[in-house]
Amino acid sequence: MDKIVTEIILPTLPQIQKLFDDGKIGKSEQQLMTGIIANSILMITHHSSKSESGKNVIILSADSESLLISEAAASAFRSQNWNVFSIGDMSSAIDVLFDLELRKLLSKIWKSKEGIMIILIFSQSEEGLKFFSDSFYSVKENSENNMFIVLSGKTGKKVKIKADLSAPKLEDILQWSNTKYENI
């Protein structure tokens, strides 16, 4: 199932945007195609198998433009038996109290600290990646060694952003995550 996400769904998203930007489709057609993709992701999610208790991932989008990509990633992780906590577009949560909210969330969903916890952040802006990376690292410093931060999106050389992995391709993120889990 993850091949459907990585080889069909994800490559389709920029093509739809390109068709819209080039004026070949209108806003309603763009919305229709995006809706079809969202429904496809939901169908894949509902056909996923049971998750393994030690494989945990929190997936979020730092902006609305990355929401479908984060949902596709959640579907791909579920198809590989990960326990997925997809929290969607968190751009409205960018404030000074976010790290406190994150600690509270982690204490509820990863009580036993069993296995591995990967926090996967998608963003089309460096600012979004930097904010969430900084917040997660403030929490990570006081937590277990089996928590990892993964970034996917636009990163440049101007801004220093901390991450255990920064990768544009979901296939690379999935492979790295599974390898990390196998090595704990």
Regions picked out by a protein language model, each given a short descriptive name:
Residues 1-4, 26, 92, 101, ...:
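General structural signal for secondary-structure boundaries
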Residues 1-48:
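Long amphipathic alpha-helical segments
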Residues 23, 81, 88, 151-153:
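Glycine-centered flexibility sites
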Residues 35, 39-138:
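Conserved mid-sequence domains
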Residues 82, 146-147:
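A structural micro-motif
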Residues 139-144:
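Short, conserved loop/helix-junction motifs that constitute active-site signature segments
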Residues 147-184:
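Peripheral docking tails and interdomain loops at the edges
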